[in-house]
Amino acid sequence: MAIQRTFSILKPDATERNITGAINALIEKAGLRIVAQKRIHMTRGQAETFYAVHKERPFFGELVDFMISGPVVVQVLEGENAIAKYRDVMGATDPSKAADGTIRKAHAKSIGENSVHGSDAPETAAIEIAQFFAGNEIVG
């Protein structure tokens, strides 16, 4: 398997409860390296651009409002099969359906406030990483 990078966001519900360290521990326990990380407060424009794929969905406005409601931690994760591995460690979007030991089972408050985002494909990972990180900010 090839080394791959994926993009992660620790969402406002995670930063508000000061559980970013616990989430990072689960990420690292899964064998992923955090090769870039910064805490930011997304602007409305950043959130709308990031979630543009959901623009026509009824929850879009609520999602954008949530993502700008407090700080987030944006990250680049690296490892073998990183995209699938991170999606496994995140768990199902609905925390009640997430497997034991996953981030969402342990920490998500609801389907909407589910603590983390992870890229779903190599193409989206590249786009999402480029939205928040310059190449020299990623240090493997």
UniProtKB/Swiss-Prot annotation:
Alphabetically ordered keywords of this record: ATP-binding, Cytoplasm, Kinase, Magnesium, Metal-binding, Nucleotide metabolism, Nucleotide-binding, Phosphoprotein, Transferase
Any GO CC annotation of this UniProt entry: cytoplasm
TM region(s), chain numbering: none
EC assignment: 2.7.4.6
Cofactor(s) the protein needs: Mg(2+)
Catalysed transformations (reactions): a 2'-deoxyribonucleoside 5'-diphosphate + ATP = a 2'-deoxyribonucleoside 5'-triphosphate + ADP; a ribonucleoside 5'-diphosphate + ATP = a ribonucleoside 5'-triphosphate + ADP
Binding site for ATP: K11, F59, R87, T93, R104, N114
GO biological process, one term: UTP biosynthetic process
Localization per record: Cytoplasm
Coarse class of the protein's main subcellular location: cytoplasm
Enzyme's top EC category: transferase
Sample GO molecular function, one term: ATP binding
Active site residues per record: H117 (pros-phosphohistidine intermediate)
Subunit structure: Homotetramer.
Its job: Major role in the synthesis of nucleoside triphosphates other than ATP. The ATP gamma phosphate is transferred to the NDP beta phosphate via a ping-pong mechanism, using a phosphorylated active-site intermediate.
Similarity field: Belongs to the NDK family.
Protein's name in the database: Nucleoside diphosphate kinase
Gene: ndk
